[in-house]
Amino acid sequence: MKSRDNLLRLKHFQVQEKTRQLAQIDMMLAEFERMAGDLQNQIDVEEKKAGITDVSHFAYPTFAKAARTRVENLENSINDLREKRAPAEEALKEAEEELRKAELKEARGGSGDTTDPVVEEQIERRMMIG
């Protein structure tokens, strides 16, 4: 009984952790996209002020050149985060499925559970340790 309760709590924790990770990725994506947009607006203002849009021109504004590099770096980071989002979303779905299975097992009363009490105790200790 105790190990099943702990297993259920563990599965809840795993779902919460995966949800937090996915939310963090989404938050970072939104922030990076906002920053890239702001920098692009500043680049446009600098180019308009200088009247030069050719990056290779000798009089191209230094700030605009540096901001353009920063936008490229942000776009690379955005692409990396998008690549990380799909596996994080998949991990969340898997954790939710495991939680659902554990809840169903708990609802059935754990029938068919013929584990050795010594093994259950070891599993419980490992869950407590980490």
Can you say where each PLM-predicted feature lies in the sequence?
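Charge-rich amphipathic alpha-helical interaction elements
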Residues: 1-130
